[in-house]
Curated annotation (Swiss-Prot):
Subcellular location: Cell inner membrane
Cited InterPro entries: Membr_insert_YidC (IPR019998), Membr_insert_YidC_N (IPR028053), YidC/ALB3/OXA1/COX18 (IPR001708), YidC/Oxa/ALB_C (IPR028055), YidC_ALB_C (IPR047196), YidC_periplasmic_sf (IPR038221)
Protein name: Membrane protein insertase YidC
Source organism: Campylobacter jejuni subsp. jejuni serotype O:2 (strain ATCC 700819 / NCTC 11168)
Keywords per UniProt: Cell inner membrane, Cell membrane, Chaperone, Membrane, Protein transport, Transmembrane, Transmembrane helix, Transport
Phosphoprotein as UniProt keyword: no
Length: 528
């Protein structure tokens, strides 16, 4: 039979279950794109439809007669550009065929630097495709000539690589100015007009997983952003007045940007409906470019607007300040793991007044449990009177069954924000914490943190006052630590560390409040 207390308790149980299951299941379904079974290298042959620009050149012809990535061998590299931070290789088609970041965090298990140019996909950065099939075919047969085979970019300098290609009746010149951090400027000139597409490159395809968004985005001159997630592109589109476009995965991105003279951009799709971005022109083309990590400091040093590629989802308004605060703590602490611990403690302190109110209310409900049971028995045949007497009991003793839900509701956006920050922060990659945790961006190799997190959650349940009468609801609550432990096993250690410390704080707070409440209760009973 329904009554007010059961309804309140059911809402609290439902809220806890919804938070756990919706977060891990439905959130991933709606906000994380499905992974393609196989990555194709060709662009769709579909004609451009419903575009925002009527004079967009047809990309169909530009997708034919392009070389397979497998055909581009080491022998085809005509120039190498290096700095302290990166190495770029330019092939005979005038493209960046390989790009390496020279830092330990960008090494694979074999100790080799990761190539940010995906060899399984097309197009490569700075690859040009012409609308005229005959020009396009010839462009992938006649090699470019470079003015230098090796260039080194000083820490405060730049180097210009000049590439030239002479086709039948058409000369193509590419001037690429490289800067130390991996950003560059590209200028293309043709001896006569010819419609062509040029790409910043397919997304790096290095850090692609089921947890994060990957695909492409376009920002116009009003700073309105359109995101195209992998698997979601249904038709070819185009946009004008574009100041920045990027293809990205979890940690890495490739860009074209021009905040002074906006670009015209076409968004095509491959066989798996993944976005492929091209800028297009019929002669001169100028843009800034970047290949590298989505590290905030680097992106901000190039242009703060590039930070838009770091995706935080719906809770960006909370996540961005959270990251800035975490970064601030790291500057003083020098360790990302301990910065996460300190940030969690500070957040818990800020939320303590609400938590305290909730815990006191739960203790009051525990004391009222015998009286509540008596009311249910006395008025079990009259739900209206039962509810009325329950409300009078709550009012008399200052108890509010719904007050326990408010802190949880307020913590939902904070948790989602911290979740997105810790999941997307390249700064945590290869960043150690202490003991056995040598990389906060990957799962705990020994599952110690998830188990500790589950244990603290279980202990918290043991000392938290419960007034649940329904055995089924009680069983569901007991299984929550197991469910959370199971899901967190594969989560990055940084995120699991946050949740473990958060649980530890809750455990300590509950223990202290239980002691305080017990003393107050003892005083009242002694005085009586």
């Amino acid at each position: 039979m329904n009554n007010s207390n059961n309804i309140f308790q059911q809402k609290r149980i439902l809220l806890a279950v919804v938070i756990s299951f919706l977060f891990f299941v439905i959130y991933d379904y709606f906000f994380i794109p499905k992974q393609p079974l196989k990555i194709e290298q060709n662009i769709t042959q579909k004609n451009q439809q419903n575009t925002s620009i009527n004079n967009t050149p047809n990309i169909q012809n530009a997708t034919t007669n392009t070389p397979s990535a497998a055909l581009v061998s080491q022998d085809s590299v005509i120039s190498k550009v290096q700095s302290k931070h990166f190495e770029a290789q330019i092939d005979s088609f005038g493209r960046i065929s390989a790009f390496y970041l020279k830092d330990r965090k960008y090494q694979n298990e074999k100790g080799e630097f990761i190539n940010l140019v995906s060899k399984e996909n097309s197009p490569y950065p700075l690859e040009m495709r012409f609308s005229d099939p005959s020009i396009n075919s010839e462009a992938f047969k006649i090699p470019y000539v470079a003015n230098a085979s090796n260039l080194f970019v000083d820490e405060n300098g730049s180097q210009v690589l000049k590439l030239t290609q002479n086709l039948s009746g058409l000369k193509i010149e590419k001037d690429i100015t490289f800067y130390p951090k991996g950003n560059y400027e590209i200028e293309v000139k043709l001896s006569k007009n010819a419609n062509y597409f040029i790409s910043p490159g397919y997304r790096p395809n290095i850090a692609v997983d089921s947890y994060t968004v990957h695909g492409a985005l376009v920002m116009d001159n009003k700073e309105t952003i359109e995101t195209y997630k992998d698997g979601d592109v249904e038709k070819d589109e185009s946009a004008n007045n574009v100041v920045m476009t990027s293809a990205f995965d979890r940690y890495y991105a490739t860009f074209f940007y021009n905040f002074d003279k906006p670009l015209n951009v076409a968004i095509s799709k491959d066989a798996n409906q993944n976005p492929i971005v091209f800028a297009y022109s019929d002669n001169e083309f100028k843009a800034g470019g970047y290949i590298g990590s989505k590290e905030h400091v680097i992106l901000r040093s190039i242009d703060p607007r590039l930070e838009a590629v770091v995706e935080y989802g719906w809770f960006t308004f909370i996540a961005k300040p959270m990251f800035e605060f975490l970064n601030f703590l790291h500057q003083y602490i020098g360790n990302w793991g301990w910065a996460i611990v300190v940030m969690t403690l500070i957040v818990r302190i800020i939320l303590f007044p609400l938590t305290y109110k909730s815990m006191i209310s739960m203790n009051k409900l525990k004391d009222l449990a015998p009286k509540m049971k008596d009311i249910r028995e006395r008025y079990k045949g009259d739900p209206q009177k039962m509810n009325m007497h329950m409300m009078e009991l709550y009012k008399k003793h200052g108890a509010n069954p719904m007050s326990g839900c408010l802190p949880i509701l307020l913590q939902i956006p904070i948790f989602f924000a911290i979740y997105r920050v810790l999941l997307n922060a390249i700064e945590l990659k290869a960043a150690p914490w202490a003991f056995w945790i040598h990389d906060l961006s990957v799962m705990d190799p020994y599952f110690i943190l998830p188990i500790l997190m589950g244990a603290t959650m279980f202990l918290q349940q043991l000392i938290t006052p419960m007034t649940i009468q329904d055995p089924m609801q009680a069983k569901i609550m007991k299984f929550l630590p197991v469910i959370f432990t199971f899901f967190f096993i594969t989560f990055p250690a940084g995120l699991t560390l946050y949740w473990f410390v958060n649980n530890l704080c809750s455990l300590v707070q509950q223990w202290v409040i239980n002691k305080i409440f017990a003393k107050e209760h003892h005083k009242k009973t002694s005085g009586a």
